[in-house]
Regions:
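N-terminal glycine-rich FAD/FM-binding segment characteristic of electron-transfer flavoproteins
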Residues: 1-156
Length: 156
């Protein structure tokens, strides 16, 4: 049995951005756009669920965001996750990747009891591809990036 934690993110659906959603400073007003499950994180969740199906264990999804990010966590439960955690505080608004990875690493430490941590390659809103690697660094664990398939897993 293997326990997995999956970091997921709710992102704005940027498929149809118009001038109506732009702020005066040129940034996107996220409240004016529908929110969606970040595609790369959905792929990470699907991979974790494949490990669960093949070897047993549990899948926990965690996200940092506003209260409406619970929609993504609900979707994780529908897909097969066993439990979810939403970390939300107005102070987190606009957090950079270092702050985000710090918060997520602290949450993961509190959850504990994991064999794997999955993260999508990058979020479509920031496009940095830094939160997964930075979280691994803060946890002091090795990372493997750009994984598309897990063929076999053994303890130790």
């Amino acid at each position: 049995m293997f326990n997995s934690i999956v970091m997921v993110k709710q992102v704005p659906d940027t498929a149809n951005i118009s001038g109506k959603v732009m702020k005066d400073d040129g940034t996107v007003n996220r409240t004016k756009l529908p929110a969606i499950f970040n595609h790369e994180d959905r792929v990470a969740l699907e991979l974790a669920l494949q490990v669960k199906e093949k070897y047993g264990g549990k899948v926990t999804a965690v996200t940092m965001g506003p209260p409406r990010a619970s929609d993504v966590l609900r979707e994780c439960l529908y897909m097969g996750a066993n439990e979810t955690y939403l970390v939300s505080d107005r102070k987190f608004a606009g957090a950079d990747t270092l702050a985000t990875s710090y918060v997520l690493s602290e949450v993961i430490k509190k959850i504990g009891n994991y064999d794997f941590i999955f993260a999508g390659r990058q979020a479509i809103d920031g496009d940095t591809a830094q939160v997964g690697p930075q979280t691994a660094e803060k946890l002091g664990i090795p990372q493997i990036t750009y994984t598309e398939e897990i063929l076999n897993v053994e303890k130790n």
